[in-house]
Amino acid sequence: MPFLDIQKRFGLNIDRWWTIQSAEQPYKLAPRCHAFEKEWIECAHGIGAIRAEKECKIEYDDFIECLLRQKTMRRVNAIRRQRDKLIKEGKYTPPPHHIGKGEPRP
């Protein structure tokens, strides 16, 4: 038992928020990766860690991609590099509002 239990004093359960996104959320909004986590938990529930690691790999990989967005960021960086290359070669001119020369907005 902690010396000063702030979570209990204020009625918060922060540990639950940090471990499972499927838990009750403070403003009743589903987290971004709730569906992927739910699929992974449903797949892995009751079969053990070793079997779950093999049999639920697809669900786990989807969940981790949703959390970390590594593939998405790699794709965005590839698109950005290609755009910069085309600009450098003179084959592409970005619109004025992309380079800060557009009309001012109210």
Curated annotation (Swiss-Prot):
Supply the PROSITE patterns for this chain: CHCH
**What residue stretches are annotated with the CHCH domain?**
30-74
Q: What's one GO-annotated cellular component?
A: mitochondrial inner membrane
Checking InterPro entries in the record gives: NADH_UbQ_OxRdtase_FeS-su5 (IPR019342)
Residue ranges annotated as motif Cx9C motif 1: 33-43
Motif range (Cx9C motif 2) = 56-66
Q: Where in the cell is it found?
A: Mitochondrion inner membrane; Mitochondrion intermembrane space
Tell me, which GO biological process terms does this entry list?
A: mitochondrial respiratory chain complex I assembly
Which cysteine-cysteine pairs are annotated as disulfide bonds in the entry? 33-66, 43-56
How does the entry describe its membrane topology? Answer: Peripheral membrane protein
Region forming the signal peptide: none
Q: Which UniProt keywords apply?
A: Disulfide bond, Electron transport, Membrane, Mitochondrion, Mitochondrion inner membrane, Respiratory chain, Transport
Q: What is its main location?
A: mitochondrion
Q: Where is this region: Disordered?
A: 87-106
Instruction: Share the domain note from the entry.
Output: Contains two C-X9-C motifs that are predicted to form a helix-coil-helix structure, permitting the formation of intramolecular disulfide bonds.
| Function according to Swiss-Prot or TrEMBL | Accessory subunit of the mitochondrial membrane respiratory chain NADH dehydrogenase (Complex I), that is believed not to be involved in catalysis. Complex I functions in the transfer of electrons from NADH to the respiratory chain. The immediate electron acceptor for the enzyme is believed to be ubiquinone.
Assembly information from the UniProt record: Mammalian complex I is composed of 45 different subunits. This is a component of the iron-sulfur (IP) fragment of the enzyme.
Protein family: Belongs to the complex I NDUFS5 subunit family.
Name by which UniProt lists this protein: NADH dehydrogenase [ubiquinone] iron-sulfur protein 5
* Organism, as annotated: Macaca fascicularis
